[in-house]
From Swiss-Prot:
It comes from Cryptococcus neoformans var. neoformans serotype D (strain B-3501A) (Filobasidiella neoformans). This is Nuclear distribution protein nudE homolog 1. The gene is NDE1. Belongs to the nudE family. The lineage of its organism: Eukaryota, Fungi, Dikarya, Basidiomycota, Agaricomycotina. Residues 40-64, 220-310, 369-388, 397-666 are annotated as: Disordered. Required for nuclear migration.
Length: 666
């Protein structure tokens, strides 16, 4: 600050005087303030001194009081020390006593723990034994329950077997009666129709085939279709052609739907005009009836020209009108039988038996593909008429002609004894009639050179397709149709050559409900699963429904059925030499059949139904080749075994095991 004052320069003495005067005033004010502070400090110090003196006096007094208190506490301390010593002595004695008692309790506790450990070990052993006993008991209970379940399943299987045997016997009896009535009706129809011999001339082959088909449609309507009857046939019959009696078909489910004709049905059947296809309705038709009913291609009644075709007689018109009125009665009985057959299939369906589907009924009965039949030997001397254009076109695919075919297979015709194939339900009947011949999409003609017949005589049981999901199908009555694919492929089954005892071997195998054995002397009906698609899945009319063959070789077989095989050791026995001679005579009239048209109802039904699954979808299909015209099946060769190039399909499991698996899943 002094340096600052030295550095200050004044411009004039007055400024310097004013400056120092100001500083003097400041120093004087500071001195006055300092004096006031000093006086105040002195006064506060005096007051503080007085307070300290008072406090010192109070502290002296308090110190005296504390000394007296210390003396009193010392006395009390001595007193409590004596008391403490006495209590300590008492505590020591008590502690020693408690220690002795605690030692005693510890020893007792150790003994108790040892005893408890022994008890626990014994308890563990007992519990272990109890668990072992409980486990053994549960095991025995499970075995007992399993044995009861197996016993129950076996009892159910036995009950189902008894029911199936009863139903099978009943259906066979009904079938036998129906066949007898059909035979009577066929005889009456053969006698009822008498064709006038007028207007005899050389007939046109195209018209002959059309006339034959129209008659076949009429007969199919009479027997199977609930639709309106066809127009009375104006044409004549040609070389009769039908289907041979299938040896295993008598045990299949198809025949179970043939109703037992009531008296009204008999009366109506006596008035129905005869057509060549009616000769296929009976197995007991004699050769005289066949010759009288069908005639021969060379007879004057069959050699009319198109211009000389006689019109339907008034008596025949009356018969058709009567048939139109009374036809529903027979179908009522038919549907009753079909309902009972469905009930039987539903019972079998509850057991979840694996069913092998029939994908195309054309491969089961040869519908619309080829027709084979055995006829009476009276038609062995007949000659086939000239083939028309359609038959020739169909026969060109197989490198032969209808004339050559008729020469190779004489004696086959529609008038041969066969079976009636009935559809299931009214909605599945195929409308037939002469009007259906104008429709396109015709199946193959039955005049193919690969056409073969393995049926023997009309008094044998009829074969069915292998794998038909019929609860009444037995292992000894499998279809011989599947054997035709092996003939087309030119192969011979190595496991069945010369096997005469196929029936006996097949029934010795364990069978599922689809293979329940039945007596071989009676017929076996087929399930509706077979003949149900017969009306809907094939583009054929009534003629194709009757064209059922035991071993029809179909080159265009459905893909879903070409892999099917007949179980080894099953099927009808091989043909004898006499049977072959009968086949050779029965194929003369084969070339007289014409193409079968497709009706509109068939196309609708076929569109509604999808293709059926094949049980051999992953298997290579055997190549189907047309058999040579002159080839014949050897006498020792079976006709019911299919040839496979891969592993054959597995045999269905027994129903008891399947039912057991279904219960386990539930």
């Amino acid at each position: 600050m002094v340096d600052d004052e030295d550095d200050i320069t004044f411009d004039s003495p007055e400024e310097e005087i004013a400056h120092y005067r100001e500083k003097y005033r400041q120093a004087l004010d500071m001195l006055t303030d300092t004096r006031a502070e000093l006086e105040e400090f002195q006064q506060s110090s005096k007051e503080l001194e007085d307070e300290m003196e008072q406090e010192l006096a109070a502290n002296d007094k308090q110190q005296a009081d504390l000394r007296e208190k210390i003396k009193r506490l010392d006395a009390e301390k001595e007193e409590w020390r004596t008391k403490h010593i006495a209590l300590q002595k008492m505590h020591s004695s008590t502690t020693s006593a408690m220690q002795r008692e605690m030692d005693n309790l510890r020893s007792e506790r150790d003994k108790t723990l040892v005893a408890l450990r022994d008890l626990e070990m014994g308890n563990d052993e007992l519990e272990r034994n109890e668990r072992v006993a409980i486990s053994s008991l549960l095991d025995l209970e499970s075995k007992y329950n399993r044995a009861i379940e197996e016993k129950t399943l076996l009892e159910q299987d036995l009950a189902q077997k008894d029911e199936l045997e009863t139903e099978t016997q009943r259906l066979k009896d009904e079938l036998r009666e129906a066949n007898e009535e059909i035979s009577i009706l066929k005889d009456q129809l053969a006698r009822a129709i008498a064709t006038p011999p007028s207007s005899v001339s050389t007939s046109s082959p195209i018209h002959d085939a059309a006339c034959d088909l129209s008659r076949i449609h009429l007969s199919d309507d009479i027997n199977a279709s609930p639709l309106p009857p066809p127009v009375p046939s104006k044409n004549k019959s040609i070389t009769p052609e039908g289907h041979s009696p299938r040896r295993g078909l008598s045990r299949s489910g198809t025949m179970s739907s043939i109703p037992v004709a009531s008296p009204s049905t008999k009366r109506f059947s006596q008035q129905i005009p005869h057509s060549p296809s009616f000769s296929t309705l009976s197995r007991s038709t004699t050769s005289r009836n066949l010759a009288a009913a069908a005639g021969t291609p060379g007879s004057p009644a069959l050699a009319r020209s198109r211009s000389g075709i006689p019109q339907a007689s008034p008596a025949r018109g009356i018969v058709l009108a009567s048939h139109q009125q009374t036809k529903s009665r027979g179908f009522k009985l038919l549907h009753d039988l079909q309902a009972r057959l469905k009930a039987t299939d539903d019972k079998l369906g509850g057991a979840k038996v694996p069913r092998r589907n029939v994908s195309n009924p054309a491969s089961v009965f040869g519908v619309g593909k080829r027709v084979t039949s055995t006829t009476s030997t009276t038609s062995s001397t007949t000659t086939a008429p000239a083939p028309h254009a359609r038959v020739t076109a169909l026969a060109k695919d197989h490198n032969t002609t209808p004339t050559a075919q008729s020469q190779q297979f004489p004696g086959s015709g529609i008038m041969s004894p066969g079976w009636v194939l009935v559809g299931e339900g009214e909605g599945e009947d195929t409308p037939t009639g002469p009007w259906s011949m104008t429709l396109p999409a015709e199946p193959n003609s039955p005049l193919d050179p690969t056409f073969r017949s393995s049926s023997t005589t009309s008094n044998r049981s009829l074969p069915s397709r292998p794998g038909i999901p019929s609860p009444l199908a037995s292992g000894s009555a499998r279809s011989t149709t599947s054997g035709t694919a092996q003939r087309q492929a030119g192969q011979r089954p190595s496991s069945r050559l010369g096997l005469k005892a196929s029936r006996r071997d097949s029934e010795a195998r364990p069978l599922s409900p689809s293979m329940i054995p039945v007596p071989s002397f009676s017929s076996r009906p087929m399930s509706p699963d077979v003949y149900q698609p017969l009306r809907s899945a094939t583009p054929t009319s009534g003629f194709s429904s009757f064209s059922a063959s035991a071993s029809t070789s179909n080159p265009p077989r459905p893909n879903s059925r070409t892999g099917k095989r007949n179980p080894i050791g099953r099927g009808p026995p091989p043909l004898s030499s006499s049977t072959r001679l009968h086949h050779q005579r029965s194929r003369q009239s084969l070339s007289g059949a014409g193409p079968t048209p497709t009706t509109g109802a068939d196309k609708v039904e076929r569109a509604k139904r999808g293709p059926r699954r094949s049980s051999l979808s992953n298997m290579d299909k055997p190549s189907l080749m047309s058999a040579s015209p002159g080839s014949r099946t050897p006498s020792g060769r079976p006709t019911s075994v299919h040839v496979f190039r891969e592993t054959p399909p597995p045999v269905p499991r027994i129903p008891s095991a399947i039912l057991k698996e279904s219960k386990v899943k539930k």
